């Protein structure tokens, strides 16, 4: 009986490993934290392929740049790192503005510390196609607004987020995000899986 149970557990574990081995994900997490009296908000960005952190940007670094966090990313040339650094700095500026906007929506003073988070990414199925894309924002550690599974509409959790939703609908932001998640995100994931094929 014990041997049968052990074999069943091993078989279940192998099934989980095989299922997981065929699926992969690319995720980015961005966070901005206001620091009254200390200058601009702190901004950090990290990227993961599956459960492996592969890039990081920290606005408080001596020379803020997108940096490799996985050995296999060291294969990328200087043009890649310059481009990714510029993208991260663009996110940093945009995020700081969004943090100020959220503070105004919630009638909060600039004197306190506030946090804005953004998470997005794509999951690839074992067939190499998009399994799901996702994008969501949180303010002060609570859900704020999220792109729905259809990648066309938004869920806004409160009145402040409704303002953002209306602005984004008018600007066609969902369409741009959908194009990124279905296109660039998946292409990037395939590239990173190739670069890290020995360890991922």
From Swiss-Prot:
It comes from the Eukaryota. It holds the Pfam family MHC_I. It comes from Mus musculus. Residues 112-200 are annotated as: Alpha-2. It is a single-pass type I membrane protein. Glycans are attached at residue 107. Residues 22-111 are annotated as: Alpha-1. Heterodimer of an alpha chain and a beta chain (beta-2-microglobulin). Disulfide bonds join 122-185. InterPro entries: MHC_class-I_related, MHC_I-like_Ag-recog, MHC_I-like_Ag-recog_sf, MHC_I/II-like_Ag-recog, MHC_I_a_a1/a2. One of its GO terms (cellular component) is external side of plasma membrane. Keywords: Disulfide bond, Glycoprotein, Immunity, Membrane, MHC I, Signal. Gene3D superfamilies: MHC class I-like antigen recognition-like. Involved in the presentation of foreign antigens to the immune system. One of its GO terms (molecular function) is peptide antigen binding. GO terms for biological process: antigen processing and presentation of endogenous peptide antigen via MHC class Ib; antigen processing and presentation of peptide antigen via MHC class I; cellular response to type II interferon; defense response to virus; positive regulation of T cell mediated cytotoxicity; positive regulation of type II interferon production. The gene is H2-Q9. Residues 22-200 are extracellular. Belongs to the MHC class I family. Its main location: membrane. It is found in: Membrane. This is H-2 class I histocompatibility antigen, Q9 alpha chain. Residues 1-21 form the signal peptide.
